[in-house]
């Protein structure tokens, strides 16, 4: 789990939640006013885990702020449960904080209404019925929401709920985890937000297949140090290679990444292999200034190391539907196989944050963002 999310998982006081938000943004007078308001509006309400309810919207706003610093989007995250869980109305929200915020809060309230009407909550429901209901919910959700900012706040809301899922009964944990995989993960994927997608997948995986999760987690913990040492050596060699061939030290970044648990599990299931046979448990990621630099770096790497041609993929020339662009290559060095991902810094922002990396606004209005085109 991402260290940032691990820290948020431990926060259980209003003061602690506000401190986390302050680490991400300078809290404006408008947002301070909204924080004071939601603390009062949700007074006397507590989550199943015992903390004051307003801790939740503040932490949802904290997660949201990593994708957008837009004041109205963060305000929406803070207010996302007000209409549903307190006596205050959308008209009140619009009068106090404007139509842009009230429209987004309305979208989030609509999501809650759709879920309430369509999703099965009985603990006796079969897995098949739960999945079918979740698929229906996803279709209706996508059809009814035309602002991607609403979906991103909802994804952040779901992530915080997943972080605190342990306090619920086991049958509810599994139902919510399955709903997360069927409804929210595909939306995060189509919006290109790998940061949210990967966290949601692993949290859901933990509750749906705990034994399989533990096996993968134990293997990674047992082997991570040795594998990391091997990759550190390879990173140093690759960095030296690129710097010798014209790349400046301060214009490139090279680091390793570990494949997340659910992705490992899917590859094992799809290919019928053991975890030891998954070639890309670890990979190195090379960030360079421009598209052409990606190909320059690739050329130098293929001249230095023998490539495994069958595993080469050029997602720059042919991007994924969600906008993902990266060159994937696999090479041999010292009788070991190393996966390498090469992308520009801009491509990395899109890969991590998806549509949120290139939101464009003019006078508070969205420019050319259509959820139906992206997801439908």
Regions found by a protein language model. Give the residues of each.
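Active-site helical microenvironments for divalent-metal-assisted chemistry
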Residues: 1-338, 343-376
């Amino acid at each position: 789990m991402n260290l940032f999310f691990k820290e948020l998982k431990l926060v259980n006081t209003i003061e602690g939640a506000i401190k986390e938000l302050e680490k991400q943004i300078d809290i404006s007078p408008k947002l301070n006013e909204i924080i004071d308001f939601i603390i009062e509006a949700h007074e006397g309400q507590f989550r199943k885990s015992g903390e004051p309810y307003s801790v939740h919207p503040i932490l949802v706003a904290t997660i949201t702020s990593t994708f957008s610093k837009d004041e109205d989007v963060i305000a929406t995250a803070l207010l996302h449960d007000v209409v549903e869980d307190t006596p205050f109305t959308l008209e009140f929200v619009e009068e106090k904080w404007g139509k842009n915020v009230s429209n987004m809060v309305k979208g989030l309230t609509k999501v809650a209404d759709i879920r309430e009407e369509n999703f099965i909550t009985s603990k006796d429901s079969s897995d098949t019925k739960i999945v079918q209901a979740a698929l229906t919910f996803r279709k209706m959700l996508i059809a009814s929401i035309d602002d991607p900012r609403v979906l991103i706040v909802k994804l952040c809301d779901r992530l915080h709920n997943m972080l605190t899922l342990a306090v619920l009964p086991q049958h509810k944990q599994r139902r919510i985890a399955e709903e997360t995989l069927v409804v929210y993960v595909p939306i995060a994927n189509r919006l290109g937000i790998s940061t949210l997608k990967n966290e949601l997948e692993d949290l859901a995986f933990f509750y749906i297949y705990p034994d399989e999760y533990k096996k993968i987690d134990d293997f990674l913990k047992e082997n991570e140090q040795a594998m990391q040492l091997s990759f550190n050596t390879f990173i140093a060699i690759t960095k030296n290679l690129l710097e010798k061939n014209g790349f400046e030290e301060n214009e490139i970044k090279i680091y390793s990444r570990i494949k997340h648990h659910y992705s490992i599990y899917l590859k094992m299931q799809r290919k019928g292999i053991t975890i030891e046979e998954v070639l890309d448990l670890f990979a190195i990621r090379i960030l360079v200034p421009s598209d052409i630099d990606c190909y320059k770096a690739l050329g130098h790497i293929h001249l230095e190391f023998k490539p495994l041609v069958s595993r080469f993929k050029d997602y720059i020339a042919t991007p994924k539907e969600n906008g993902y662009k990266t060159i994937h290559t696999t090479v041999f060095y010292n009788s070991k196989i190393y996966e390498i991902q090469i992308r520009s810094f801009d491509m990395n922002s899109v890969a991590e944050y998806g549509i949120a990396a290139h939101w464009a606004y003019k006078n508070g209005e969205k420019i050319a963002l259509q959820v139906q085109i992206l997801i439908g």
